A protein has these predicted regions:
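Flexible "cap/lid" loop of the alpha/beta hydrolase fold
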Residues: 102, 106-107, 111-143
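Active-site loop/oxyanion-hole signature of alpha/beta-hydrolase fold enzymes
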Residues: 51-92, 252
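Gly/Ala-rich beta-loop-alpha elbow adjacent to hydrolase catalytic centers
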Residues: 93-97, 101
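Conserved alpha/beta-hydrolase catalytic His-Asp/Glu region
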Residues: 126-128, 145-199
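Catalytic active-site module of serine/aspartate enzymes centered on a nucleophile-bearing elbow/loop
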Residues: 230-262
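Alpha/beta-hydrolase fold catalytic core
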Residues: 1-25, 46-48, 86-87, 255-262
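Conserved HGGG/HGGXW glycine-rich cap/lid loop of the alpha/beta-hydrolase fold
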Residues: 12-62
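Conserved loop-alpha-helix segment in the C-terminal half of the alpha/beta-hydrolase fold
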Residues: 203-238, 244
Length: 262
C-alpha cells in the first residue's frame, strides 16, 4: 500500500493500486489505525482498488494544526477522492469508522456506492439515553488512558475483540495511540442527530459480533427497524471489531453484499 499525505491536512491515506473499476474505502476503529484491516487488504487487493485512511490523531495522521478535529474528516476524505479522481467508494466502517462513514454519506451521498457499518449505531437517530451511557463509558476509558495507555489498551482489547489473536493485534495498535490525540475526538458529538435519513440511493449493510455488548446488539436492532431495507449481519464468535475476529466470514459477507447489490 502506497502512503500519501493529503496536502493542508493532518491525514495520511493509503492506496493499493488502480487496476480495477471499483474502490473500497476502509475507516478504522478508535485507538488503532488502518492496519486493523490487513486481512481485508489481503483478500480484496486483487479484486478492488483499496483506499484506507488513518483517522486524525491515529497512526500516521498526527501532524495537526490548531482547529483540526474529527468533525473535518468527511471534508478531508472528499478531498482525497478529488485528488485521486475517485468518483464513488464502497465504504466499510468499524466502530468509530462506522460513525465517520455515515457522516461522510450524510455530506456526500453521491460519492457513496454502498455503505457497510459494523459495531456502530445510526447517528441520525441516536437515543439520548444511549448517548449518555456511551458518554459515561468513554469518560472512564479516557481517565484510564490518561493514567496509563498500557493499562487502557489491556482493558480496551477485551471489549474491542473476542478472539485472543484479534485482542493481541488490537493491543499492539492501541498502545501506539498518543494521549494528546483524545482532544481531536471532542467534536464527535457534532455529527449526532444533525441529519434526517432520507431515501438512500445506495445499499446499506449493518452488523456486529454476537459477543459485542448488549447496547450494540440493540443499536443494530433499532437501526434495522428504522431502515427496514438494510441488510443485517450478526457474526458468531466475534466481538466488536468483527473484521479482526472473523476475517474470512467478514470478507465473504461484505463481498456478497457488493456483488448482490449490483
Amino acid at each position: 500500500m502506497k502512503s500519501i499525505k493529503l496536502v493542508n491536512s493532518p491525514i495520511t491515506y493509503f492506496i493499493s493500486g488502480r487496476d480495477y473499476s471499483e474502490w473500497i474505502l476502509f475507516i478504522h476503529a478508535a485507538f488503532v489505525n488502518h492496519n486493523m484491516f490487513k486481512s481485508q487488504f489481503e483478500y480484496f487487493h486483487n479484486k478492488y482498488n483499496i483506499l484506507a485512511i488513518d483517522i486524525i490523531g491515529h497512526g500516521q495522521s498526527t501532524d495537526t494544526q490548531k482547529g483540526d478535529g474529527i468533525d473535518k474528516m468527511s471534508e478531508w476524505i472528499f478531498e482525497i477522492l478529488k485528488v485521486e479522481n475517485i468518483e464513488k467508494v464502497h465504504i466499510v466502517g468499524v466502530s468509530l469508522g462506522a460513525v465517520l462513514a455515515q457522516d461522510f454519506a450524510n455530506h456526500y451521498p453521491n460519492s457513496v456506492s454502498s455503505m457497510a457499518c459494523f459495531g456502530g449505531y445510526d447517528i441520525n437517530n441516536v437515543d439520548i439515553k444511549m448517548q449518555k451511557q456511551n458518554g459515561a463509558k468513554q469518560k472512564v476509558m479516557i481517565l484510564k488512558a490518561l493514567f496509563s495507555i498500557k493499562w487502557f489498551a489491556k482493558e480496551n482489547k477485551k471489549i474491542s475483540a473476542y478472539t485472543l489473536q484479534a485482542q493481541d493485534e488490537f493491543f499492539d495498535m492501541n498502545i501506539l495511540f498518543p494521549k494528546k490525540s483524545f482532544i481531536f475526538m471532542a467534536s464527535l458529538n457534532s455529527m449526532i442527530n444533525k441529519y434526517k435519513t432520507g431515501k438512500r440511493n445506495y445499499p446499506l449493510l449493518i452488523g456486529c459480533g454476537s459477543f459485542d455488548i448488549p447496547m450494540e446488539l440493540e443499536a443494530v436492532k433499532q437501526w434495522k427497524i428504522s431502515e427496514p431495507n438494510c441488510r443485517v449481519a450478526i457474526f458468531e464468535n466475534a466481538g466488536h471489531c468483527v473484521n479482526m475476529d472473523v476475517p474470512q466470514e467478514f470478507n465473504e459477507t461484505v463481498e456478497d453484499f457488493w456483488t448482490s447489490a449490483e
